Amino acid sequence: YNCKVTVVSCKTNAGDILNLKPNGIFLSNGPGDPAATGKYAIPIIKKLIKMNLPIFGICLGHQLLGLTLGAKTKKMNLGHRGANHPVKNLIKGNVEITSQNHGFEIVRKNLPKNIQITHQSLFDNSIEGIKLKSKPVFSVQYHPESNPGPQDSVYLFEEFIKSMKKNAKKKRY
């Protein structure tokens, strides 16, 4: 896809990230409780969302995005671990086979109105994907980079790249 990727620490401030002149932000996976990481990550993510940059989060990045947008997270009774987890794409109506490794989830109850649920687990109906209704900001709970099925989730990267190309045309930097 010919993307230039710059990796920064999760504690890098928004100003330093914006000085890199990104066309998009990828919120990666990682271990642990999203609320603990959120103490320093949420203010950074809020500033990046205000810049109207495309943002794509996976796993912990998905949970942090949810927290940033006003959702709550909780520890699951039974985490999702392994391959072959069926997830329904609520926009397209199809089922994707995913790989997962998480023990926390975004809570459905009292979800802010600016969040659209895009994906749902067929095992327990937990939220597997969200998007911000007004901006090119979205995330999934699972690992689309692992390609457990016949590239079931490659479209997520294509959507993100399309958003970054559109953003690059704005020549904001």
Region spans (language model):
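RNA-binding accessory domains that recognize and position tRNA/RNA substrates
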Residues: 1-22, 32, 147-149, 155-173
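N-terminal Rossmann-like NAD(P) cofactor-binding module of classical short-chain dehydrogenase/reductase
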Residues: 26
